[in-house]
Amino acid sequence: MRKSAAPKRPVVQDPVYKSELVTQLVNKILIGGKKSTAERIVYGALEICREKTGTDPVGTLEKALGNVRPDLEVRSRRVGGATYQVPVDVRPERANTLALRWLVTFTRQRRENTMIERLANELLDAANGLGASVKRREDTHKMAEANRAFAHYRW
């Protein structure tokens, strides 16, 4: 085990939108080290968002992430031979990571033709409080609410 926590590395802002969130999204989309492909997908999707909404695409991304970010999650805790699902608060950084992960996961499951269209539509759905990634957040919250009785096992 480590002696101390690994230091957090700074996130570089992306060159087009000057946003750390966009950089994180590019890195989540990334497969097989093909960063230029990932950037093309993200920038293309943000451009579609700009055309459809007529507003700043980074604002749309932030709104979408705000609707997907979980406040609570359940973590397994073993107590005397039984495993309980204990609801815990989610740290802001982890909430962001989970939101991005869910967005990308459900983007890949969509049925549109190109990845650019899928990402754009998932972002727009999430910004409007719709879509599979928002449902995932609600399911996570429901699970935490259902297991509130075990909240005293929190650590």
Curated annotation (Swiss-Prot):
Cystine crosslinks: none
One cellular component term from this protein's GO annotations in UniProt: small ribosomal subunit
GO molecular function, one term: rRNA binding
Keywords: Ribonucleoprotein, Ribosomal protein, RNA-binding, rRNA-binding, tRNA-binding
CDD domains: uS7_Bacteria
Domain of life: Bacteria
InterPro entries, per the entry: Ribosomal_uS7 (IPR000235), Ribosomal_uS7_bac/org-type (IPR005717), Ribosomal_uS7_CS (IPR020606), Ribosomal_uS7_dom (IPR023798), Ribosomal_uS7_dom_sf (IPR036823)
PROSITE patterns to which the protein is assigned, alphabetical: RIBOSOMAL_S7
One GO BP annotation of this record: translation
SUPFAM superfamilies in UniProt: Ribosomal protein S7 (SSF47973)
Subunit details: Part of the 30S ribosomal subunit. Contacts proteins S9 and S11.
Function: One of the primary rRNA binding proteins, it binds directly to 16S rRNA where it nucleates assembly of the head domain of the 30S subunit. Is located at the subunit interface close to the decoding center, probably blocks exit of the E-site tRNA.
Family membership noted in the UniProt record: Belongs to the universal ribosomal protein uS7 family.
Protein's name in the database: Small ribosomal subunit protein uS7
Gene that encodes it: rpsG
